[in-house]
Amino acid sequence: MNALTTKEETWKLIGQLMKEGYSTPFELAVFSVGGKMGVMLQGRAGYDYTPNSLIKESLSWQLANKPDLMAKIRPLRGATTRGFDIEKYPMLVTVFQELGISLDDVYLPDMNPDVIEAGSVEQNMQATLMMQNTSVEEWKEALTEFLLQDAIYFDEEALEYVNSSEYSSLTYRQAAENFAERYLNYEKSYEFAKAYVSADQKQLMTGYAEELRQTFRERIRNNVWMSDASKQNATEKINAMKFNIGAPDEWFEEGLADLSQEQTVLDDVLALRSARMNLKCRLAGMANQRASFHVIIIEEGSLTTVNAFYIGNYNAMFIYPAFMLPPTYNPEVNDAHNYANMMAWGHEITHGFDTDGARWNKIGDLEDIWASDADRQEFKKRSQQLIDYYSTFDVMPFETGLKNDGAYTVAENVADLGGFFLAYDSYVKHLKKQGFTGDQLRLQKQRFYEAYGYFWSGKWTAENAKNKTLGNEAKGVAKDEHSLFRERVNGVVTNTDDWYDLFDVKPTDKFYVAPEKRIRIW
């Protein structure tokens, strides 16, 4: 570094340092655009920015009924994925060439659109130009500072020195744990999958998922409120949806660090960071669905967590191993239990068509599935019916007054209702193939409903119910975008016709809903 004399040499060194796992002012962001993986540099020092951060997945459903805001958001997202001007940004050209990434896969915001938020296009542009104009001596000083930050991973004496200066106090163990939480996800997931996700198990679970896909196709075909053109769009989307189940279909060696020869934690740090960077470079330009599971693991967390979710800009569902193992899936129990638990999978599939998911097309770009405004308005009307219905539920166990927030939870409630129908219809088809008829068929249907209730069984205090519903900033409890467990059961089954027949529910019963008021969306 001391031998640097030109900016070009400095930029080239930055790329080399990134490849070797050292700290620099930059991180490499990978994101989905136009059905493939694009990349861009995001700054570490206050310039964090990725195209998808402008609309958080967990909040974007709230834009569904705000067309004016959506009209502004669309050009913003378009701006974030425009290829950059090579002549204007020679620093980026040099860094990406050193990383071995094709410039065809590189993006940078190059305009100031109408909507500016934190981590904005304008801020990122200014930061990039500022760094590009930084002198060699200033770069040396900055790079030295970044490299010295890694001293905390070398030994306890180095950590003590760093803590005594400008950094927050950490123990050596805490520093290592923080690092592991961020950089060990791919290796940890690889080892976990080898132990718990067999090829046979993955094939079996994929078979269940394909049953749900086929059921969704049938429900689209039988839908009574959508036009044929919108049905075609929805069918194309469910056909194209990627099911990431258990573990990636393939693992990339670039992302797996060999730690067997490393002597210090710092050696591990550099090796793992280097592997992470090499994997991101490998993913650049790849089809977004093929890359999706790898990106999620390195960016969001390892397969050891209990998680299942859908991400619109991949048009992909992700099912982690916990949902394939006991007690969630258990081959030793009645099929009703396992199919009822598949509701969680159906829930994630339906997220691709909820108040947020319906805005994404089959390749994961922002283009909703509605072929006509009449379909769009009917979907909004039915979603509003669900909002109104869920808003009638009292969430406190032994008192009235606090109602469920149907608007805040609408996307999850749409997914719950759709997920139930996908799992239940699939189970009934399975039973009929097995030869169940009459009273035995009825009994198995009842068991499905009971298993669904068991899936959502839980126990908590009235205070927790209140905090989850309203949020409690003082206690660090965020408002939950999901309805509480009891409401997730009652809100769904009361909108299904079979519940009334199977459990002899009468018009005089508390949760009776007249047939014409039962809500159907998907």
Predicted regions and their residues:
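Zinc-dependent metallohydrolase catalytic domains
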Residues: 2-25, 29, 206-343, 351-522
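Noncatalytic, helix-rich "gating/capping" subdomain that lines the substrate-entry/channel surface
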Residues: 1-212, 261, 266, 278
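Walker B catalytic acidic pair
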Residues: 348
